[in-house]
Amino acid sequence: MSSEESNPKQADLEIAYTRLSPSQNPGDKESSYPTIIFLHGGESCHLEFSRVTPFLTDDYEILLVDLPGHSRSKSIPFSFDNAVNALSHLIKTQVKGGKVHIVGLSLGGFVGLQFARRCSELVLSLWCTGCAPFSGYRHWLRSQSRLLSGIIFVAGRLATERIFWASLGVDPIPGLRAEVKNNQTITLLKPVFDELVSVTLENFAEIQGVRIAIIAGGKQDNVEDTVEAGKVLRSKNPECNAFVVRKAIHWWSLQLPEVFAQGVRAWVEGSEMPKVYEPLLTAVS
């Protein structure tokens, strides 16, 4: 059962965030740039976008949040309800115009999709990756939430800094590994997995009026599930699309930050996606 069905809603939850603003012209009293909120993956924090944002900060107001249960927002239990309500409060109180573009990776993508479903009036567009509803063994594995949480907890304690970064094939980002390790608790992981397995394509069919790009990292994400998710999204809005970046791993904000940022910029601006983003839907899908 999802949190939406089982927990009473809370209002005005305040999640931690970092604001990155373009340089202001002398005399400007407040930013007139579009706002993008970045939502990180499970176990992680806002630092995972450290290599992406330098390609965007000249042209956008950027808010990098720590999702409930994670890092600076650890005091707020993770649930989709809490994440949606905290994001809604953040947008209404901290964003000029009260509407944003959202970028989400993995868990952050699932949160972004839930937010678009429940608060579409606050969303200008959504760009999300690694967040198609799970099927087959991927769904079964995450449904074993206590067991999987325990395995990740133990593995996180055993993995050295060198092993952690070598497994991703990327250069270290200062501070990120420590945050991931601190977030790898059963208290956080179990509710994350319980929420993830509650997500269905029927949920996606309830999203109205939001232009969404859903993307698969070709090396690790399930491309077929991404196609099916894209079809459902497009059935509700012909401007939605699905893509695969063939060389991307799941956590590719670390691996291909410039390509990641190029796709975000294109989607936000409504321009043609870079060629490395291979469309997965036909014109009539």
State the predicted function of each range.
Residues 13-74:
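Conserved HGGG/HGGXW glycine-rich cap/lid loop of the alpha/beta-hydrolase fold
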Residues 23-25, 51, 63-103:
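Active-site loop/oxyanion-hole signature of alpha/beta-hydrolase fold enzymes
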Residues 104-108, 112:
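Gly/Ala-rich beta-loop-alpha elbow adjacent to hydrolase catalytic centers
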Residues 117-118, 122-154:
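Flexible "cap/lid" loop of the alpha/beta hydrolase fold
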Residues 137-139, 154-210:
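Conserved alpha/beta-hydrolase catalytic His-Asp/Glu region
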Residues 191-235, 244:
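Conserved serine/cysteine hydrolase catalytic core
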Residues 242-248:
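Short glycine-rich catalytic loops that host catalytic nucleophiles or stabilize transition states
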Residues 248-261:
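Catalytic histidine-centered segment of alpha/beta-hydrolase-like enzymes
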